Amino acid sequence: MAAGVFKSFMRDFFAVKYDEQRNDPQAERLDGNGRLYPNCSSDVWLRSCEREIVDPIEGHHSGHIPKWICGSLLRNGPGSWKVGDMTFGHLFDCSALLHRFAIRNGRVTYQNRFVDTETLRKNRSAQRIVVTEFGTAAVPDPCHSIFDRFAAIFRPDSGTDNSMISIYPFGDQYYTFTETPFMHRINPCTLATEARICTTDFVGVVNHTSHPHVLPSGTVYNLGTTMTRSGPAYTILSFPHGEQMFEDAHVVATLPCRWKLHPGYMHTFGLTDHYFVIVEQPLSVSLTEYIKAQLGGQNLSACLKWFEDRPTLFHLIDRVSGKLVQTYESEAFFYLHIINCFERDGHVVVDICSYRNPEMINCMYLEAIANMQTNPNYATLFRGRPLRFVLPLGTIPPASIAKRGLVKSFSLAGLSAPQVSRTMKHSVSQYADITYMPTNGKQATAGEESPKRDAKRGRYEEENLVNLVTMEGSQAEAFQGTNGIQLRPEMLCDWGCETPRIYYERYMGKNYRYFYAISSDVDAVNPGTLIKVDVWNKSCLTWCEENVYPSEPIFVPSPDPKSEDDGVILASMVLGGLNDRYVGLIVLCAKTMTELGRCDFHTNGPVPKCLHGWFAPNAI
């Protein structure tokens, strides 16, 4: 374990009190002095909703919004940093706020509403933070002894139910998600919270990801963690389509975690026609630190451990038998979102928005966001790239080895190249040099000497390694190593991509061509860029507008689509700077990424930037 790589995760972030005058990012922007990222307005993440908009409001329309679009774009994300005179420490702690853009006959209305969680009620009643979150420790309750705190470890309902990350459908109902076992059913038309579900009541898991997969049949799969006699294990949960999806939930596959005291941190998982794909990164939740945090009143981020010298594992599990088929490994990397997975020509392809390490999570602390303009490392810490890993299936016949290409090196160190000068100071972490090594498919400078093998970083400089990837057109590599098959990815595009979306209903788990994302490069010319990536030819189309910060782009297909990108992109928008009482909806042609129409709303209070959402057809 590398000391210092995850240092800020170990801080006791006890309900930080935020000095708005001292840390106001708008002050430097207005002065025009000392801003390292002059095109990026971090304040869009620091806003708090002061007044809900329960009743839909009308906006100003421009352009042409196709009349065939009928439904509601539902959004979820951080709604408020404040409770009384206290402030949360991390973006993931903020109270969940829902947004709704109702679209019908070319017209749009907007409303927002907080998710009515138990956590929100408790905090508002006490007028202080009384439930511990990811980056914020609760105010100690003097009535609770150490024995009470110990007993709470084994009660699922003692943790936060702040479901502020995503929204997914279960049948004709919609639920908000977080990474605890709680979800909330919401009304897609009024945004009212109708019920709370605890997955633990139906299947024995202690948590689950905030990104389940919804099949065309209506069945939902999710990945959870359970405790067994032999230690923690990952479990694939099935919620069969029907009137009792939760009551009928069951486990279809179980995989032991590689470390008994350190289950991996899981934000999502993958699915193909025949396999579940579990990507086990070396970011783990320390069970011993979790107990210490519960007893000592620390925030939950204190439990995370990053093992930089351990590989990332790719597990393929048979969807029929639930058995492990094969495990592959690559150099350590961090990720939140898998773009898509699919099978092709005897391979499983896994596309991931990848980072060299988990430092980007630290970038979302309140203090880090507020001070980003004076942090020369911020852009590097947040830098990631979409990578493609190709996993060869089956055994490799000896006779075919001579026909395969040779692998010259193996490294993930070339994850990205910065869009700023190479003289820029980098992170003091182990991976501060991620910008100088080539990623496969990105050629090194002529005469540049490759670094020698470094076992701690997982690099390989052995000659004559046999490339096991035979998929036509792929630049990804795999080879037989001493511990199994080693993977080396190819880069899909040289943009930082986050919150990726595809034509989900038709291409989830299938061979696809396009995905859509928002830019994660804070040092870009326009950080608020929407990106369309063609993974076949690795080309990009973009849309951006100065000082506009769009949300995750949602693809909505045309009524009778003739191609994968025949449809529109829907994204909400906020503005950087002083205009925090604005929110809008942009509608783009998915083929060309050009604007079709928009609707602008002026609200009665600040509107924060959101995270994830879902288009609910006919929810009008």
Curated annotation (Swiss-Prot):
Biased composition, class Basic and acidic residues, residue ranges: 449-459
Keywords: Iron, Metal-binding, Monooxygenase, Oxidoreductase
GO biological process, one term: retinol metabolic process
Required cofactor(s): Fe(2+)
Ligand binding (Fe cation): 211, 267, 337, 612
Reactions it catalyzes: all-trans-zeaxanthin + O2 = (3R)-11-cis-3-hydroxyretinal + (3R)-all-trans-3-hydroxyretinal
Cofactor mode of binding and number, as noted: Binds 1 Fe(2+) ion per subunit.
Taxonomy, superkingdom: Eukaryota
Pathway the protein acts in: Cofactor metabolism; retinol metabolism
Enzyme Commission number: 1.13.11.65
One MF term in the entry's GO annotations: carotenoid dioxygenase activity
Family: Belongs to the carotenoid oxygenase family.
Entry protein name: Carotenoid isomerooxygenase
